[in-house]
Amino acid sequence: MMQMRFATKGILFTALALICIPARPVAAQAQQDQSKVTYTIPEYNAFQAARAETNAQNRLKLLDDFVTKFPSSTLMTYVDQLYISTYTELKNYPKVIEYADKMLAMGDKLDTATRLQTLQTRVQVFPFAFNAKAPDAHDQLTKERDAAKEGADLLAKFPKPADSKLTDEQFAEQKKPGIAFFDAAAGFADLQLKDYPAAIEAFKGATANNPKDAISYYRLGLSYLGATPPQSVDGFWALARSINLGVPDADKIKDYLRKAILVYEQPQCDNLADQQVTELITLAGTSGDRPATYNIPSAADLQKVAGASTILTVFSDLAGGGDKAKLTWLALCGAQFPSVAGKIIEVKPGNGFVNFEVFAGASDDEIQKATTANMDVKVWTTAPPAGAAGTTPAAAQPDVARLAKDDGILFSGTIASYDPSPFLLHWDQVKVDPSVIPEKADAGKHKKAPAKQ
């Protein structure tokens, strides 16, 4: 798998309010509990003083004083909630997680709404607090995954309040962003743990409930590519979907997608990946799931096509257009053919080269009757300039200038490009077989096209 580093503090979860299940404010809960009066007036006043303090550092001192003076207070749950909000304000995220875990350890003593709110806060700040190099990094990720999965499960099962004016369908719809949030968090932890099947499942859940979540699609793509064996095409689709939705660092992800496709296909013409990526991003904008009919050929697929191709099948496959032409071109762009025979239809001298317009066909009779070229064969008559096509341009052949219209030609070369209509296959890095080049004395005496060797 090609690795792309992604920062745990770079792409973060968007803040989310679980508006469908509002938890009671800390003050309201404490005031409601006054009817039970299980705490003293000094405890209550100390708590209210801490709650009313607007300076976070001063509030923290008041909370610490409260815990020192009243370590067994029945208000401790509300104190812990204030600790969580205060440490969040101070951006001390490890402490937020510490107090969230303390509250979650209370189990059934927490009402469901408060538990969900605490899970949400814990999950939301985790990417800020997580240190991948910490000795307990694996344990941190496991706890984060478990908290996120619990949050998704609790929210999915949370019943509609009796006084809600929403229909069941509306209430279920309102919960979807929250469930997606928790699923995305679980997927993030699974991805870091390299549990790719679990990450795929989590991110698919997240994107099903929030189809516009570009970050989850990005991470789903990484999960597919990290699986064993890699689910490459699904991974490419998910990455393209994330780019279409405007994921942060889209240009970098697009470059990564291009490189990943090149590694997967190993084509000889790297520039073809640019067109593929553009097309893929456009298509992925129409659907979160890859259509069963869409595919990207692997290197093995392209090698199979190339191995079964002849110059005649290249003509028919490329001229036919459609998916067959795309596949054939991916397989054969830049391919070298050792022996191609045809008849020269026209000679076009250039600056240091000659372009032979050539026809190749299935039979000698077809070749001799041809009047229209289906190949453009470029042969250098002087040393090719720096930057000429091909990594190892063919040596100059000045003697090819003696070849004329209607002469037969036999050459080896590399397919460079093609025009679909009228069809014309362009060749470069060409070497004409010396045996078909007439001697000076024989120039103008036409020879029929030689048989392919």
Where are these regions (language model features)?
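TPR/TPR-like (Sel1-like) alpha-helical repeat modules
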Residues: 103-105, 139-156, 225-251, 258-262, ...
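N-terminal leader/linker segments that initiate helical-solenoid repeat arrays
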Residues: 25-82
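Pro/Ala/Gly-rich low-complexity, hydrophilic intrinsically disordered segments
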Residues: 155-163, 257-325, 431-453
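OB-fold single-stranded nucleic acid-binding module
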Residues: 305-308, 312, 326, 345-453
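Short solvent-exposed coil/turn linkers within tandem alpha-helical repeat scaffolds
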Residues: 69-77, 105-115, 154-177, 206-213, ...
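Structural motif corresponding to the intra-repeat A-B loop/turn of tetratricopeptide repeats
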Residues: 53, 90, 129-134, 138, ...
